[in-house]
Amino acid sequence: MTGLVFDVAPPGELLSVTSLMKPTRQQILQRKVDMTQETIDVSEMVSQRMGHSLHDSIERAWTEGNWQAAMRKLHYPQSIIDKIRINPPMDKPLEDGIIPIYLEQRGFKKFQDIILTGQLDFLIGSSYRDFKSTSTFSYTSGSRDESFMLQGSLYRFIFPELIKDDVMRIEFIFTDWASYRARSDKKYPQARVAHKEFKLMTLQETEFWLSSKLADIRKNAKLPQSRMVECTDKELWRNDDTFKYYSNPETAKAGGRCTKRFDKESEAVLY
């Protein structure tokens, strides 16, 4: 596996994990936009800022709070609590049995002609964890599962000495959870918090993905916008088109429920 890991940014073009995961077209065109001339809708920043505040609170709970007392309340044995170390030095070997917890660690890794950078939010032992404040739909539909897995795989690529487990875990904190839905639908999250585990790509698979992505960016960066690769439906989180039939046109105007739904327009017309 090629690439070197650095504690501080070495000379070179920085490219973040989150940026690299964006569609190629979006990534290229964003660089051509003068953001100082753009009008920002503050309301669109609410979810992002809530996510930042959540991560900040979790970090401070471990670095500034009485986490030992919190673990005792959760009935962790003192023998486990005594083995926890918060952000121990990465350049020194740990004593046998010690359980490291790393929070908000930024790393840099040289790969081909770029410097890949990412911030590791939470790691316990050798397992990567992340926390997401999101909708219940994101959890039940699995619409972002592949994105979570890819992000975790890229972080492992940057921090191979820390992230050794092949499985990562996402802790979900739902912003729209409703207890009445949990009672009536067993597929709905049964509590305001839940988790999922994802198998990470191998380091070789991740390196192949990186090489392919960078090649795609280089190729399209030379093209005029009209010839650049289009964003796929998957990248746009767009589902297949559906066609609805309403027996009463007034129901359609009011946004009511359709009489029948079709996958193809021709089927709807024939009906």
Give a label for each model feature:
Residues 146-163:
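An active-site-proximal "capping" alpha-helix that borders the catalytic cofactor pocket
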Residues 121, 130, 151:
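Acidic active-site catalytic centers that drive phospho-/nucleotidyl reactions
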Residues 112, 158-271:
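Metal-dependent nuclease catalytic regions and adjoining charged, substrate-binding loops involved
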Residues 1-127, 139-146, 178-187:
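Metal-dependent nuclease catalytic cores that hydrolyze phosphodiester bonds in DNA/RNA
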Residues 131-135:
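Activation of the activation-loop gatekeeper triad in protein kinase-fold domains
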Residues 53-61, 154, 158, 209:
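Amphipathic alpha-helical segments that form well-ordered structural scaffolds
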